[in-house]
Amino acid sequence: AFSCCLFTWTAKSGWHCKNIEIPNESGILCVLGSGSKEFNPNYERYCTSANSGASRNVFHCFIDTLFNTTDPACGGPPQLVGIYRKPGTNAANFGIIYNKKRYLLGMELPDGVTYDTIEWRNELFEIADGSTKKKAHSAASQPDPFRRK
C-alpha cells in the first residue's frame, strides 16, 4: 500500500506534513506550481471525456496544458512517475518520447544507450519503443480527443 504526504516549509512555522488521499482509480494526487492555474480548469474539461478515471486522461491533460501554456515558467519535456496499484509493485519512472527525442526525468538521453530497461511512453501515453522512438507495435492507440495542438 502506498501513502502520500505533501511536505511544505516556511521560515515562520517550519516543516508541515499534509497527508494526501490516494484515489481509488487513476487520478491526481496534487497539482502544484504556477502551471496549476492553467492545468486545473483544463482538467475539469478532460474529466468530461470517456477516458475519465484512466491514467492516460491525466497525462493527456498534462501534455495539452504543457503544450498550450501561457506561463513562461512552464515548459520543457514532461516528466512522468507512475504508481501501479497491483500488489508487490513499486512506483516507476517512465521515459518520455517528446519532439522525437528521449527524456528521463526531464533529461535528454543520448543515442547509443540501452533503452530496454526503461518503460517508455510517447506524448499520447502510448507504450513506445525507446530505441526507435515510435509507438510499440503491440501498443494500443491512446487518442486524445481534447488535444488543442
Regions found by a protein language model. Give the residues of each.
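N-terminal nucleophile
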Residues: 1-149
